[in-house]
């Protein structure tokens, strides 16, 4: 996250720059909280874009994993995590440590049958099955 003064659409704005785990880089007006820009900075399949009116990502129906499962980017580790990013306003660049780790999400078979999620000791219990890209090779 970074604070900056930038020219946006011909007007100087005080902005917050943020690259969260969801894969979109946000430019947010610090005065009113409005999302001014939002573009992917890494591979993103779970959403098609960010609605600038609401500030919310628009989910991609093609990656609905309810019936058959789906590969999703970024995975639960995120496109960017706690590592610091850096901004060079003169060059117009943001330097962001990113990662692209796809995960395959699928609904647990037990849940499909019973409506109850199965808790498994020693695993991420997120209410769905998760597989890394390494698992696809096995």
Segments predicted by a language model, with ranges:
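Surface-exposed acidic, glycine/proline-enriched linker/cap segments
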Residues: 9, 47-78, 113-130
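Loop/turn residues immediately N-terminal
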Residues: 23-24, 101
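Beta-propeller fold detector
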Residues: 36-44
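Conserved small/polar residues in nucleotide/adenosyl-binding loops
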Residues: 131-136
């Amino acid at each position: 996250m970074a604070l900056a003064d930038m020219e946006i659409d011909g007007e100087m704005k005080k902005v917050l720059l943020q690259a969260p785990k969801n894969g979109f880089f946000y430019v947010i007006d610090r005065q009113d909280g409005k999302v001014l820009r939002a573009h992917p900075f890494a591979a993103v399949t779970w959403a098609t874009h960010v609605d600038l009116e609401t500030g919310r990502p628009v989910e991609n129906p093609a990656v609905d994993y309810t019936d058959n499962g789906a590969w999703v980017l970024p995975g639960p580790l995120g496109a960017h995590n706690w590592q610091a990013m850096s901004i060079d306003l003169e060059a117009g660049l943001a330097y962001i440590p990113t990662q692209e780790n796809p995960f395959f999400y699928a609904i647990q078979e037990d849940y499909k049958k019973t409506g109850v999620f199965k808790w498994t000791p020693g695993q991420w219990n997120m209410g769905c099955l998760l597989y890394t890209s390494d698992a696809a090779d096995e």
